Amino acid sequence: EDAGEILVDGDAVFDNPQVKQNLFYLSDAPYYFSNATLQTMKEFYQNLYPQFDQDGFEMLIRQFNLNENKRIRTFSKGMKRQAFIILAICSNTKYILCDEVFDGLDPIVSKVVKDLFRQERKMRKMTLVMASHDLKELEDFCDSIGIIHKGDLLHSSEIRKETSDMHKIQCVFEQDEEAFLREHLHIVRYGRTGNFVTMVVKGEKEAIMQKIQEKTPVWCETIPLSIEEIFLCNMEGVDYDISKVIF
């Protein structure tokens, strides 16, 4: 059973039109009237958001080559997504809540949308909250990450902090050094194929590498840790049974 209340900047959202004028929900399946055109939906959102940016709207539909007089139901999935991203940005809200916002966009349009959001964030105070299963799309875009499972927030932190405190290291040892490494390092994940070891370790990078060098590895280097790997490491840390999801 759901409980509690939702606050935005300390104010309740429920039955509060003034607060809602600062929120735009960008759904993975945007709602539009059956025979609506982009022009129709623009007029609809202009009534909801007095601060709607008409000039910005006209500029963006030209940039994305969208016909504002064509019925939205004739648009492709990607075109629909582009249309509602434009409406979201031009509504000039303080917060945009995005659900699978890059789904259905080809790589080029996806990059254009990211650049558009970045530009908008530089021009005004605006926060994007994104829900996504495609973590790769968020890797070079988001400042913070939160992991939600069954209604609970399992983990949240700044991505920059995660990548500075967690390191993926690959080494080659002449003999098995797993016991030593586990004793002296905070190992989150460990894998070994022959003498080739791949591990994810938490802690200060310099101290970790110094400890590894005590065993004189034949070869050792750190490699970039993806946001997906950070996700998996954190989920394993809370005993999340990923097999139930995959299988």
Q: Predicted segment positions?
A:
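Conserved coupling/switch loops of ABC nucleotide-binding domains, chiefly the family-specific signature
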Residues: 2-5, 150
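Conserved ABC transporter NBD signature motif
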Residues: 4-19
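ABC-family P-loop ATPase nucleotide-binding domains
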Residues: 27-83
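Catalytic Walker B motif of ABC-type/P-loop ATPase nucleotide-binding domains
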Residues: 96-100
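Helix N-cap at the start of a conserved alpha-helix in ABC-type nucleotide-binding domains
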Residues: 107-109
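ABC transporter nucleotide-binding domain
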Residues: 113-203
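C-terminal coupling/interaction segments
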Residues: 200-247
